[in-house]
């Protein structure tokens, strides 16, 4: 991914006119929701890393975020605890210093499986990105029963390099299902069984936007959400985009837009807790990172 080396933040989304792959987009309507988390550079949960990478909600609505030094790497995995049952301006609290984890690679996306191969909860991080950091490995991060970060293992995928990965425990009639994505290709995998085999390419011409970079994806019982960020080839007036597909890769809603704010704000990932959706934006100019609601 051609990244803007910047400071992360998370913004809400806005919807635009549906378009075909690689077609120019029209102006979108901002669908930004309320801020739920603000992450300044001084936060202990980022350990001096300035770039927000993958993000996912885990057990009990805890939030896990990868921060890195951009092309310099040195990723860390941070954990944020839910602060009560009310969604407000401080919905998560930093659990302390993050874990240095070189095996995360680029850490472009995070998925959460509450019972990975029957062995309990785990995060799954993509080591690769769209093109700048190609890698077909993913890193399994085992979690304790309380969501604490534990041991890791690396798994090689037969799909080749992927940039986005998600898991839904409620998909496939409750059997669970994975989705993986890179550019126009979408693969799925049953919820059970090793990730080293069993993948199916379900579509090779997904709708997405030109002059944008692959970022994280999220999935639920019936849908998959894909994020495309601004990059160094995007016009100054360009937007970030989210696309909603069904599990066959068919369009449900296209060009859900997030303002790029003159190439300041770069979407990185999308995740949900129950019916609440959140997006993560990496920002330039020393601005604090933020997690905000996606209003549907």
Language-model segment annotations:
Residues 41-75, 106-109:
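Beta-strand-rich domains and repeat architectures in extracellular enzymes and scaffolds
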Residues 85-127:
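Blade-loop segments of beta-propeller domains
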Residues 47-57, 102-115, 156-172, 209-219, ...:
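Repeated scaffold domains used in trafficking and secretory/extracellular systems
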Residues 71-83, 130-142, 183-192, 232-244, ...:
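Structural motif
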Residues 33-46, 88-101, 150-157, 197-208, ...:
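A short beta-strand motif characteristic of beta-propeller blades
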Residues 1-27:
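Secretory targeting and sorting signals
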Residues 207-247:
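Loop/turn-rich, solvent-exposed surfaces of beta-rich toroidal or solenoidal domains
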Residues 61-69, 118-132, 172-182, 222-234, ...:
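Short beta-strand elements that form the blades of beta-propeller/WD-repeat-like
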């Amino acid at each position: 991914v051609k990244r803007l080396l910047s400071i992360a933040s998370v913004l809400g989304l806005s919807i635009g006119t549906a378009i075909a792959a690689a077609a120019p987009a029209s102006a979108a309507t901002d669908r930004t929701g309320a801020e739920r988390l603000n992450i300044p550079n001084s936060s202990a949960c980022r350990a001096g890393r300035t770039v927000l990478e993958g993000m996912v909600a885990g057990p009990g609505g805890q939030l896990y975020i990868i921060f890195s030094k951009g092309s310099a790497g040195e990723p860390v995995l941070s954990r944020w605890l839910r602060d009560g049952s009310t969604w407000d301006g401080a919905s998560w609290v930093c659990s302390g210093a993050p874990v240095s984890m070189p095996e995360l690679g680029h850490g472009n996306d995070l998925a959460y499986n509450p019972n990975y191969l029957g062995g309990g909860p785990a995060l799954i991080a993509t080591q690769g990105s769209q093109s700048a950091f190609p890698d077909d490995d993913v890193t399994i991060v085992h979690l304790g029963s309380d969501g604490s970060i534990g041991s890791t293992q690396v798994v090689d995928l037969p799909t080749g390099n992927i940039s986005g990965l998600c898991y839904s425990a409620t998909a496939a009639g409750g059997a669970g299902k994975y989705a993986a994505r890179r550019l126009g290709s979408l693969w799925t995998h049953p919820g059970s069984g090793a990730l080293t085999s069993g993948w199916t390419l379900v579509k090779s011409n997904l709708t997405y936007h030109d002059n944008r970079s692959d970022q994280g994806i999220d999935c639920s019982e019936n849908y998959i959400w894909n994020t495309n960020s601004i990059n160094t080839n995007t016009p100054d007036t360009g937007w970030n985009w989210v696309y909603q597909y069904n599990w066959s890769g068919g369009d449900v809603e296209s060009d859900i837009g997030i303002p790029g704010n003159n190439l300041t704000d770069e979407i990185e990932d999308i995740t949900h807790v129950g019916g609440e959706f959140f997006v993560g934006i990496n920002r330039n100019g020393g601005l604090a990172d933020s997690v905000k609601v996606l209003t549907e």
